[in-house]
Amino acid sequence: MFCRAAAIIAFVLLFRAALDAELPGVWLDVPYVSQEKNGCGAASVAMIMRYWQRQKGQPEIADVLDMQRLLYSPRSGGIYASDLERHLRQQGYRTFAVQGEWQDLKHHLEKGRPLIVALKAGRGDLHYVVVAGLDWQQNIVLKHDPAGRKLLKQHRVDFEREWKAAGNWTLLAVPE
């Protein structure tokens, strides 16, 4: 009987220690939306809106094709960042566009807030993705790339190089 009680106490203490240890990262269950041609901005906004709709128990109704038609600029060949912000505000979101840092990603993801970031790979155009998670032990970013796939892993060094090339542009959108 004593051995069994000691084993139970040891298990409880180990379980509690495991819970108190820092988790290796964070991942948010953001709905994935793929893009139409030049539609990474609309798809990224749709992912953020659907995430918050799901959090509120509402139907996920963000229509990416309507957003693309509404926001697309032939002059830019895509969607301006200011138009993403304006559209989100019109839909009842508070927006905060900042020149982000790694700690900003960690801070907001830990609070359950996914982010849209702009990336620029090489000489290519700007590309919007949704940062849905981080693994800070392995220095990995988990991003939803509307032109690629859900939860695409990218090493921090590569991510930060592409993010820096886009001015570290970061957009936080939260429901009002």
Where are these regions (language model features)?
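Short alpha-helical hairpin
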Residues: F15-L23, Q53-K56
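Conserved active-site-adjacent core of cysteine acyl-enzyme catalytic domains
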Residues: L19-P31, M49, I61-E176
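N-terminal targeting signals for Sec/Tat export/insertion, comprising classic cleavable signal peptides
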Residues: W27-K56
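Bacterial N-terminal signal peptides
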Residues: A5-R16
